Amino acid sequence: MKRKSFYIGLGLLVLFIIWTVALQFVDVGAIGPQGSSVGFASLNKIIHNITGVHMSLYTITDWLGLVPICFIMGFGILGLCEWIKRRNLFKVDYNILTLGGFYIVVMVAYIFFEMFVVNYRPILINGILEASYPSSTTMLVMCVMPPAIMQFNSRIKNNGVKKCVNISILAFIAFMVIGRLVSGVHWFSDIIGGALLSSGLVMIYHSVNNIAQHK
């Protein structure tokens, strides 16, 4: 199972790389604001025309992006408390340490795509043309919330409570990803890219976490 998760994660990351490279060469068209170009232009344009732009939904999903940030802070505080209590970083629970390392990897990926822009948003935000690939909100939600489920599953003993928490988090993930697409502030390819990258990283995190657990 540990190897399977790892290989699935690697496969998803390879798909993400292929998808990203394809965006540079397949059906590239200047369909964005200020003549900005994006790959899979025909597909992106069709889906963007269907969804339209809904700034109210953009605002809602933007503010709800604080939820995963609160989760990051919560687990960070938990790790800090354990570190202070045990007076040794390496005595902090393995799953908190691996989670912290995972968050660092996600942050590096985010910074990388902010520096090396693949494409821009289909609309201007406050008159500014912003980087859009991969969707940072999709990444944030899909990289933070699934590991949160894993954390809660290992800590919550009551199966009923555990099930409610899992369903609530999964519903939140679905709402955020779909909401971000329907809001029209990202191209369809941005959402796909964010989902592929996030899924790959989470599967590898899951594998590493299991390996650490059984050491």
Task: Report residues per predicted region.
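Alpha-helical membrane-inserting segments
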Residues: 47, 77, 109, 113, ...
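Membrane-helix interfacial "entry" motifs
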Residues: 54-62, 87, 91, 95, ...
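Membrane-embedded catalytic cores of phosphoryl/pyrophosphoryl-handling enzymes
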Residues: 3-8, 22-24, 126-215
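Lipid-exposed faces of alpha-helical membrane segments in multi-pass integral membrane proteins
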Residues: 15, 71-77, 101, 105-109, ...
